[in-house]
Amino acid sequence: STNTNDYRNTLDSLYNVYGKEPFAAEIRIAEMNLLQRERYQGNKAHQDSVQALIYSLCKESIAQYPKYDRINVFKNQLNEMEMPVLNIQSDNNVYPGKDLTLQIKYVNTPRLVVRIYKSLRQPEDAWRNYGKNSKSMRGELVKEVTFKMNLANSYTEADSTLAIPMDRLGLYEYVITVPGKQLTVSNRFSVSRLAALTRSQTNNPEVLVTDLESGKPIEGATVIYYKTNMMNGTIQRQGEVKTDQLGIAILPAKKKIEHIRPVLREDSSSIITNIYPYGT
């Protein structure tokens, strides 16, 4: 806006006159606050350019006014900008022989170490919060891969996709760490050929079990159904039904069913799917 530009011009004029004085750090702080308002506006390119301005303003001010009593304003801002960040999206289920795909948004994580463990959890407890005991639910380490990440600098968010091939059926947990930094992200996933979809158009909810890759219906699969125990939050097995030649299993109408998961012989680790009143 015009007001913002006028204010910025005034700050620039003041800085040109008083820049050598220690109190000119206050002018720089005001400039930084002005830039902060723009930091999340506009497109990514604009945001990145504003970030770069804030970063260089902080660096220059720390060098120029090292003894100024509010210099920590700039140091704290740099620390916040350079804080490592890791946001990860991944599939709950991976087809055997395909990749576990991790979609990552990251800031200041030069290297990532991805470790994949067999999980000692029951598949229905994949999402359960075990708190401090979570680590004890990790079994054998099956893979460890280090990825070097592209970083334009130490403060801009970037994104990337990491792929790790998975072959054997089972329930797993990935744990991602950043060497030298206190940051860990973990999640569970299953390696299974089975996919389950529910629909509740009729009185009896139906489950269709298919091959995750081809979409072909699977006959003779077992669909285990569960409900949540409201007292302690655990998921309790209620019973099971089998799929017919069309890959369809009919769930009992009268039971309170909240989760299902398909199993077929050794393919027994698929993660639960929640059932909503109108299907998954």
Regions flagged by a language model, labelled:
Residues 1-280:
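N-terminal, cleavable Sec-dependent signal peptides of secreted/periplasmic/extracellular proteins
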